[in-house]
Amino acid sequence: HEDKYHHFDLKINERGIDVKGLKKISRSDKAPTEHFHWVEIKNVSGKNGWAYSSCGYIIFETNDYWVIVETLELQDLVKNKVVKEYVDNTSEALYKLYQRKGRKDIITLVKTIDLMKIAYCVLDKSDVKS
């Protein structure tokens, strides 16, 4: 089940969960990285991004784990670590703001290790049955 308006991929016990897969830092990168994750502060419409959605949890994928973070904890991480400075390149976006030219979205790059520090729980993929 996916609800694009409320920004969640599935629900468990009435709490929305948004799952974020591995992503590249730059489009030119050969492969996605598990060491960093993009966090959407504002979406392409200029409204609150998925980090500020009504979801209860965001699940971040790594090669071997699912890192489950409460949305409010993620918001605190953004508030406490992100510098309100815009950068022009994705390679400079670690804890800074990046906005594509002509778009209203605002994203920042965070370290996966910092997500693990605030995680509600971390699940080993080998322990999770598909």
Predicted features along the sequence, with ranges:
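Nucleic-acid endonuclease domains
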Residues: H1-S130
